[in-house]
């Protein structure tokens, strides 16, 4: 009886470990594969270049003054339509509980 439980437990642990190993081996195989094809290498290089541009500019990349003017114009329209609130924050709602009248039940 004890041996059967032990074998069941060991098989469950063994299957969990094997699944974990398969996942880890799959991840590390991709991480250690430094040989990229030329298209993949260009794609990764462009992503890195974009990230550095975005960090240095602190905003949209390759956006001219037209973009900033359009953004300001659209934010102004939204403020006009929905009030003078800050558009970058979620609105704060306040709800009041309704007041109910207490109605006496007629006795029959």
Curated annotation (Swiss-Prot):
Location of N6-acetyllysine modifications: 41, 46, 79, 84, 99, 105
Gene Ontology BP term (one): proton motive force-driven ATP synthesis
Family from the record: Belongs to the eukaryotic ATPase subunit F6 family.
Functional summary from the UniProt entry: Subunit F6, of the mitochondrial membrane ATP synthase complex (F(1)F(0) ATP synthase or Complex V) that produces ATP from ADP in the presence of a proton gradient across the membrane which is generated by electron transport complexes of the respiratory chain. ATP synthase complex consist of a soluble F(1) head domain - the catalytic core - and a membrane F(1) domain - the membrane proton channel. These two domains are linked by a central stalk rotating inside the F(1) region and a stationary peripheral stalk.
Assembly: Component of the ATP synthase complex composed at least of ATP5F1A/subunit alpha, ATP5F1B/subunit beta, ATP5MC1/subunit c (homooctomer), MT-ATP6/subunit a, MT-ATP8/subunit 8, ATP5ME/subunit e, ATP5MF/subunit f, ATP5MG/subunit g, ATP5MK/subunit k, ATP5MJ/subunit j, ATP5F1C/subunit gamma, ATP5F1D/subunit delta, ATP5F1E/subunit epsilon, ATP5PF/subunit F6, ATP5PB/subunit b, ATP5PD/subunit d, ATP5PO/subunit OSCP.
GO cellular component entries: mitochondrial inner membrane; mitochondrion; proton-transporting ATP synthase complex
GO MF entries: proton transmembrane transporter activity
Pfam families assigned to the protein according to its UniProt record, in alphabetical order: ATP-synt_F6
Protein's UniProt name: ATP synthase peripheral stalk subunit F6, mitochondrial
Keyword Nucleotide-binding among record annotations: no
Major localization listed first in the record, in broad terms: mitochondrion
Compartments reported by the entry: Mitochondrion; Mitochondrion inner membrane
Leader peptide range in chain numbering: none
Lineage: Eukaryota, Metazoa, Chordata, Craniata, Vertebrata
Residue span of the annotated presequence: 1-32
Positions carrying Phosphoserine: 108
Protein keywords: Acetylation, CF(0), Hydrogen ion transport, Ion transport, Membrane, Mitochondrion, Mitochondrion inner membrane, Phosphoprotein, Transit peptide, Transport
Protein species of origin: Bos taurus
């Amino acid at each position: 009886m004890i041996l059967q439980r032990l074998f069941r437990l060991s098989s469950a642990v063994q299957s969990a470990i094997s699944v974990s190993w398969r996942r880890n081996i799959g991840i590390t195989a991709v991480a250690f594969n430094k040989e990229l094809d030329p298209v993949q290498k260009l794609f990764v290089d462009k992503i890195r270049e974009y990230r550095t541009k975005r960090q240095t500019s602190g905003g949209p990349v390759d956006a001219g003054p037209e973009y900033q003017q359009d953004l300001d114009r659209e934010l102004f329209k939204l403020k006009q339509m929905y009030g003078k609130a800050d558009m970058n924050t979620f609105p704060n709602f306040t709800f009041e509980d309704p007041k109910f009248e207490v109605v006496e039940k007629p006795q029959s």
